[in-house]
């Protein structure tokens, strides 16, 4: 009989140090994923994070934050706090924990905080609370500018106008907005997904300070995983990500999580590491020149596949 997994509610899911783009330059950042009760919406077709939820109290979350900050140093100027849901949702991040975390970050002199939230939790009050403590970047999972795709393929539960309204609320109080865009939602062909990502990036540009291109990967216990197991979904080609990055004016960043694996974005296996590394380098430099020179024999396969899909399914996006 399998042992039941015991979760330590006073330790974060994970924490790591990395480089982050800040004011056009590379900066040392600390990223933590806190274990909360999980996303209240919990219906997105590609998201498996809800399975990581647990009944963490405000004191548990403060302890998780303290544990994560042990990895920090004076070099860290950016702190990113992710909850697999919405930092601004009081049902997920109790006000007591939120306010204590903000107070401590302010005392440490952190230059920028990045949090994730759905647009319905972005209010003048919640933005002011964050901005009063330290400059905050509010990351919103827009995924696509198409309401049709967002509702039917992703089941996100809000509209493009909801995103615009939240963005305006943030900007009125001097905050920054990051828009997450999803490359290859389920039900779209490779070419459709690539064109939608480019169109979405251009539409979101007027409302976001920075764009983040997220390459769809296959997470467990999701609709996307069930489609993938039936052979109905393939994660995006890394070539498609390159085309989006080359086609959209910056700043736009991308971290190809799971690149080169069956469940993650991949090409043929031979060029995956080189292309993924070029994408990560571009996130810090915003220089598209290195992306132009990448090549592999599988690139023609990618092109032919998209042409075949267009002949089979047509151009609907």
Regions inferred by a protein language model and the residue ranges of each:
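Acidic (Asp/Glu)-rich catalytic clusters
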Residues: 69-74, 102-108, 128-135, 168-173, ...
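Distinct, well-ordered alpha-helical segments
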Residues: 91-99, 123-131, 191
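N-terminal pre-triad scaffold of radical SAM enzymes
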Residues: 6-54, 70-83, 136, 211
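Auxiliary Fe-S-binding modules of radical SAM enzymes
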Residues: 2-22, 216-317
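Active-site-proximal loop/turn and secondary-structure-junction residues that shape catalytic pockets
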Residues: 85-87, 119-121, 144-146, 183-187, ...
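Core AdoMet radical
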Residues: 49-93, 105-122, 135-163, 210-212
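Structural recognition of alpha->loop->beta junctions
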Residues: 133-136, 194-212, 273-294
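Conserved C-terminal portion of the radical SAM core fold
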Residues: 161-222, 240-256
């Amino acid at each position: 009989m399998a042992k039941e997994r015991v979760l330590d509610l006073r330790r974060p899911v994970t924490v790591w140090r990395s480089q982050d783009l800040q004011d056009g330059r590379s900066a040392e950042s600390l990223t933590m994923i806190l274990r909360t009760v999980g996303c209240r919406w919990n219906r997105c077709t590609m998201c498996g994070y809800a399975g990581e939820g647990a009944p963490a109290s405000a004191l548990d979350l403060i302890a998780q934050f303290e544990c994560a900050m042990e990895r920090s140093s004076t070099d860290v100027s950016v702190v990113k706090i992710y909850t697999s849901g919405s930092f601004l949702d009081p049902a997920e991040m109790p006000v007591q924990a939120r306010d204590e975390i903000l107070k401590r970050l302010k005392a440490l002199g952190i230059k920028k905080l990045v949090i994730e939230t759905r647009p319905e939790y972005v209010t003048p009050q919640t933005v002011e609370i964050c901005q009063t403590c330290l400059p905050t970047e509010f990351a919103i999972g827009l995924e696509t500018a198409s309401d049709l795709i967002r509702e039917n393929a992703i089941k996100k539960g809000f509209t493009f106008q909801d995103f615009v309204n939240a963005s305006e609320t943030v900007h009125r109080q001097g905050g920054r907005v990051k828009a997450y865009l999803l490359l290859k939602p389920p039900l779209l062909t490779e070419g459709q997904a690539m064109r939608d990502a480019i169109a979405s990036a251009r539409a979101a540009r007027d409302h976001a300070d920075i764009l983040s291109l997220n390459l769809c990967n296959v997470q467990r216990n999701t609709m996307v995983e069930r489609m993938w197991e039936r052979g109905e979904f393939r994660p995006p080609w890394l070539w498609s990500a390159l085309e989006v990055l080359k086609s959209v004016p910056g700043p736009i960043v991308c971290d190809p999580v799971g690149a080169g694996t069956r469940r993650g974005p991949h090409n043929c296996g031979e060029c995956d590491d080189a292309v993924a590394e070029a994408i990560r380098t571009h996130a810090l430099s915003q220089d598209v020149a290195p992306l132009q020179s990448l090549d592999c024999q599988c690139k023609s396969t990618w092109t032919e596949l998209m042409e075949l899909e267009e002949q089979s399914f047509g151009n609907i996006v």
